[in-house]
C-alpha cells in the first residue's frame, strides 16, 4: 500500500502495487 511505501521505500513499490494504493 501507499503507507507501506512511505514506511518501507525498499518494498514500497511492490507493496503499493500489491496493496492497491492503500
From Swiss-Prot:
Tissue-level expression reads:
Expressed by the skin glands.
Question: Where does this protein reside within or beyond the cell?
Answer: Secreted; Target cell membrane
Biological processes, Gene Ontology terms? defense response
Q: Can you supply one Gene Ontology CC term for this chain's record? A: membrane
Per the record's keyword annotation, is Hydrolase included, yes or no? no
Main subcellular location of this protein, as a coarse class: secreted
Which keywords does UniProt give here?
Amphibian defense peptide, Membrane, Pharmaceutical, Secreted, Target cell membrane, Target membrane
Function description? Has no antimicrobial activity against Gram-negative bacterium E.coli ATCC 25922, Gram-positive bacterium S.epidermidis ATCC 12228 and against fungus C.albicans ATCC 24433 at concentrations up to 100 uM. Has an anti-inflammatory effect, since it inhibits the production of the pro-inflammatory cytokines TNF-alpha and IL-1 beta. Has high activity of stimulation of insulin release, which may protect the species from being eaten by predators by causing fatal hypoglycemia. Is not cytotoxic to cancer line cells. Does not show hemolysis on mouse erythrocytes.
- The protein's assembly and partners: Exhibits a propensity to self-association and forms helical oligomers in membrane-mimetic environments.
The similarity annotation says: Belongs to the frog skin active peptide (FSAP) family. Plasticin subfamily.
Q: What free text does the record give on domains?
A: Plasticins have huge conformational plasticity. They can display random coil, alpha-helical, beta-sheet or beta-harpin structures.
Name recorded for this polypeptide:
Plasticin-TR
Q: What lineage is on file?
A: Eukaryota, Metazoa, Chordata, Craniata, Vertebrata
